[in-house]
């Protein structure tokens, strides 16, 4: 390597050494240590450009990103109030589970593939295509004449939504300085909490007063406005482009890690199918479920092996070997799991134990949703101001553990102060830590690795919620049956299961009702124990992340290592 002349300096010249430390360029994190020349060496240490957005351009781009992710998040939860009418129109009660799982399956399975696309193509192009796919899926759902077409539309919408969240966070990286990224990322993450609040109200209004199809039609004009705003006001920076040196069709295809992508997609499909059918359609001891779980394990191992030997790996080994990334993934898995478990089963507690309607249960779940949304945005602003994210990770672990633990103590006659206060504690904790794994990835990784790291964090957060909600649901059903056999042995559990949470009061006699809701309450508090356990396990992730300070206002983009 050619040596450059260094200016003369004395060993005691502390001022010069500090200046040199700050000015010395860091090696490109995206550079392949195996010598792969296909990676663009112009990626640099950080996707920094001289054209960060401000004023009207930044406002329009952020509005477009927030609207896009609000729609994607809304699509995940809006079905709760519309499913009864949809299943009635299609005469397809047996397909209800697939209305959500088909969306989650493609959303989860294609997260890492989008991460690869964002490193190979201009971010604006990939994000726009993802949103167009989401819009097409929404249109198919809106015009669906039967249940199979509706399920297909949900799968297409999930395929598009997979690239929306991580893509929005990557666009933020290219739009604002490093010290502002946590603040603006918090605005995008906050859209998921806002959508959780709005979904039951919007879904209920459309279903009751217009038609459930407008739950999906609404995505078309709003999504179109968001796409237009991004197309006209955001320009992908040069760093997003990759120099193409491959010759031949297969060489070009190989850039996208086809074998790794195949193994990963198939493993996720096997896992999600097992979770969807296990405990409901078939018992977990059924040979079909066991085969799916075994295939998931084998395919996942194959994916990991490919990542270590393929120079075009979807997740480069250097990313996975990074201590902060590895423990950050554990943390994000736990954060995603505890939050989704609580926001899924709190409305069921209100419907099943307190005999409230779907809309009323959604309103009474606002304490956890609003406190979570507020604290996501607040934490983003505070991380931008201070540069520190680990204190918020620990605050999240402590508060979510306390909140989930208190929720496990709920009784049938719990006072309003208890269920409101417990939700607020859990919501504050979840909000403070919800995006911190993303902050970790954007601090310890640089260049195209930052893009991959962001996609990985989003993926494990979604995967945690998907797996643990399924596990919690199976625990709910199992414990409910056990409790009914103990408290009301003369009642057929199948009657209660078919009635659902909102139909218990009409399914049993007035004399049996107190015993049934007691059984329901005990079973539901067991699901809150799942949230408590994963909240506590989040401490493992927080403890393993290196104590680094990201950029704060007034800093350069280079993070300062405070302690290891």
From Swiss-Prot:
Subcellular location: Cell membrane
Keywords: Cell membrane, Glycoprotein, Membrane, Transmembrane, Transmembrane helix, Transport
Disulfide bonds: none
Top-level division of the source organism's lineage: Eukaryota
Membrane disposition: Multi-pass membrane protein
Residue positions the entry lists as glycosylated: 312, 322
Amino acid composition bias (Basic and acidic residues), ranges on this chain: 1-25
Start and end residues of each stretch annotated as Disordered: 1-46
The keyword Zinc-finger is annotated on this UniProt entry: no
Source lineage: Eukaryota, Fungi, Dikarya, Ascomycota, Pezizomycotina
UniProt source species: Hypomyces subiculosus
Family according to the record: Belongs to the major facilitator superfamily. TCR/Tet family.
Keyword Transport carried by entry: yes
CC annotations in GO: plasma membrane
UniProt cross-references to InterPro entries, sorted A to Z: MFS, MFS_dom, MFS_trans_sf
Name of the protein: Efflux pump hmp6
Reported function: Efflux pump that might be required for efficient secretion of hypothemycin or other secondary metabolies produced by the hypothemycin gene cluster.
